Swiss-Prot record:
Flagellin is the subunit protein which polymerizes to form the filaments of bacterial flagella. This is Flagellin. The gene is flaA. One of its GO terms (molecular function) is structural molecule activity. GO terms for cellular component: bacterial-type flagellum; extracellular region. Belongs to the bacterial flagellin family. Pfam families: Flagellin_C, Flagellin_N. Keywords: Bacterial flagellum, Secreted. The keyword Isomerase does not apply.
Length: 287
């Protein structure tokens, strides 16, 4: 039996340190809910989780981008829907004004409303915007001819969607079914029967053009909607993978904490007894 060095006490102190360290680690994991709280816990796992977290935050941002893109396209589509409704009313007026039994004087009541509807078409085309970006007037300074959406967390992964230049229908030319052309809607008139007939045919082409424009916007919204679903699913899968690596098993950690708590208490008791060994030897020698 050694007297100068209390080997049992030293070993017990080391066990006590390890048990206390294990209990502290289990308590930290229970408190944070994470198995990895520092690189000391799992350096490789922490590196993987960090990359996964970066990817998932990028995917979440891409989902928001696509959702904003859908909002933008819905704004443009809603405005085109209003323009289509206005054109339908203008067509109704043109058809009524085409009636040969009306005099030019009789048509004045249609002309006034027809002119005000032309102004409203311009108003819709001029003022429709999203976040101060002109959507239907590509002649404006802050106009957009195409919207580019960052589709994922990868650089330059863009979805490009062309916008419809509704303002161009105002001063441009309209090709009729006969092959002839007329000026844009701003020049249409129902002042007489011939003008009303021409306006009716022109409005049919305008409505068709706007319908085609809305179809393009609808296709863009559909694509963005699928992209939102895709990146959301990727983000969920990435977060689940990170969770399986990083998050603590609460039941297992509770069991670990209980185990180390018991071992720590036992180590303290054993250390107390080990420290009494020299005193017992002294008493034995004295006796």
């Amino acid at each position: 039996m050694k007297v100068n060095t209390n080997i049992i006490s030293l070993k017990t102190q080391e066990y006590l340190r390890k048990n206390n360290e294990g209990m502290t680690q289990a308590q930290e994991r229970l408190a944070s809910g994470k198995r990895i709280n520092s690189s000391l816990d799992d350096a490789a796992g922490l590196a993987v989780v960090t990359r996964m977290n970066v990817k998932s935050t990028g995917l979440d941002a891409a989902s928001k981008n696509s959702s904003m893109g859908i909002d933008l396209l819905q704004t443009a589509d809603s405005a085109l829907s209003s323009m289509s409704s206005i054109l339908q009313r203008m067509r109704q007026l043109a058809v009524q004004s085409s009636n040969g039994s009306f005099s030019d004087e009789d048509r004045k009541q249609y002309t006034a409303e027809f002119g005000s509807l032309i102004k409203e078409l311009d108003h819709v085309a001029d003022t429709t915007n999203y976040n101060n970006i002109k959507l239907l007037d590509q002649t404006a300074t802050n106009a957009a001819t195409q919207v580019s959406i960052q589709a994922s967390d990868k650089a330059n992964d863009l979805i490009n969607i062309d916008l419809f230049n509704a303002k161009g229908l105002s001063a441009g030319t309209i090709t009729l079914g006969s092959g002839s052309t007329v000026a844009g809607y701003s020049a249409l008139s129902v002042a007489d029967a011939d003008s009303s007939q021409e306006a009716t045919e022109a409005i049919d082409e305008l409505i068709n053009n706007i319908s085609n424009g809305r179809a393009l916007l609808g296709a863009g919204m559909s694509r963005l909607s699928y992209n939102v679903s895709n990146v959301n699913n990727q983000s969920i899968a990435t977060k689940a993978s990170a969770s399986s690596i990083e998050d603590a098993d609460m039941a297992a950690e509770m069991s670990e904490m209980t185990k180390y708590k018991i071992l720590t208490q036992t180590s303290i008791s054993m250390l107390s007894q080990a420290n009494q060994t020299p005193q017992m030897l002294t008493q034995l020698i004295n006796s």
